[in-house]
């Protein structure tokens, strides 16, 4: 009964944890590393073919983005998640695969001229489609038997439609334990979705800490504040450019803008045009407009009953092709442009930034968390120039951090969430927080009477004995290109070592001659590089 940590350990992306019990291995999430957190997404610290079950907390790419790689490299087990997470995950993984293929094509065009080796995409659209051969779904509060000695219950985490905290009941060799994986804990009073449902009992808790060191700014009215920004900017003849996550945050923005238009809060340009420049956002919005029984909050349910279309309003335009996207920047009409990616590291948003950052009458409004190392974070931190598509762009636009609009619980609500457990858990593993946040939040939990620590990469913990098996290490994250290369090589070494260990475990029962030969080669290799 062991718990392994393979991602989002003292960082906020790449969530991946593995439970080992009764000869089975159960993975919880398999996310993409992003921004400064990235080591090397190609290398998994375990053998995919040895994973029996994958549980998915929600559809965001930092929790799902390496599932196609998992399947591509040999996973053929069961994938379990909620119905709406499965719907959103299909859209997001296909979009992610398209980005992977496009990025590889771009690198190969450049690399061919420079004589570099061919680069394969991390995975393809077909790899993403293959994931859904293994997906099964459940609803909230439904108890699902996973394998001998393990059952799962998904509870609404209030972070995104379909998002869940997952509680596992465990039994091995007569030992009974319960472990809860928080997933991403949602903020309260968000439009559309319900507040996070509190959990009551667990021996162990794996808990996120994204905002473990701060509270959200109190906002009197999201609608009024956004209307003020739009009114001021459009009145000056500029554009409001909003980098946004295509799934969840874009739909919230549409919800607010519908209210703004209904209440006629923008005086300078009452019928202002809004462009959703993200095919992914368009596809996701169709899910948000579908069968949401069991997922919506009460206010949203009332709107649906009244026949209100929550995400549509006059002069809303959905941009399809890249040609249409480019034409937006040729049109001088003041407008609102909502585009992905939310952290500005990829996607069409980068073109809109190129054409608007230098304009003093435009505004760039950040409505999403910006990870360290991303372009979005650099803009929020006040950088004066950025390079986009090989061109240096001056930052003269108004940069607005639309605080308070977050799908993550803040510090006080995280504390409230963990305090709901009665009795206190035996141990709390703090994950999904920056290197300077997760340990501090863990220490605060200790001061509140919990036993907690911030988990490290490759850490292993024996849940039956309540003791650390191996401590793991703090990965060196991406800082510079040179540093990143060193990190990637080290990650490959660790991944190779993990694969070797998995292979060695499967050698039980082989002829003694083979085992002896392999042992000799491993020892020889270690001795060769020991110095």
Protein language model regions, located:
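His/Asp/Glu-rich metal-coordinating catalytic cores
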Residues: 1-55, 60, 64, 71-252, ...
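A polyampholytic, Gly/Pro-enriched intrinsically disordered region
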Residues: 100-105, 292-305, 469-494
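Short, surface-exposed amphipathic charged segments that create phosphate/polyanion-binding patches used
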Residues: 150-154, 287-295, 415-417, 465-475
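A general structural motif
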Residues: 185, 218-223, 312-324, 343-345, ...
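Short, compositionally biased "basic patch" segments
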Residues: 191-206, 292-299, 370-396
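Hard-cation-handling environments
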Residues: 229-374, 386-387, 422, 437-439, ...
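C-terminal, active-site-flanking charged/polar segments
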Residues: 359, 434-477
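Generic long, charged, amphipathic alpha-helical segments
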Residues: 387-418
